[in-house]
From Swiss-Prot:
Record-given protein name: Co-chaperonin GroES
Subcellular location: Cytoplasm
Gene name for this UniProt entry: groES
Main location: cytoplasm
Pfam families recorded: Cpn10
Organism: Staphylococcus haemolyticus (strain JCSC1435)
Amino acid sequence: MLKPLGNRVIIERKEQEQTTKSGIVLTDSAKEKSNEGIVVAVGTGRVLDNGEKVAPEVKEGDRVVFQEYAGSEVKRGDKTYLILNVEDLLAIIED
């Protein structure tokens, strides 16, 4: 498993739908990458100038929305994860 350092999180990106609302089946090249995902690991947080540590606002299992072109993709086995800074998270999805 990957363990993020500092103020980073690891996201498992939500899969895009295979078909459109009108029933058209999309190929992998036609699908846009989703900017939603599940937090699978959280780093220890950031350190302020005064030495105080601030923990990230998200936790493992949170569904989040992140900036479209943020982060770096990393493959582990058959899964692809996205490592990004907490600042690149835009919202937590609450249902």
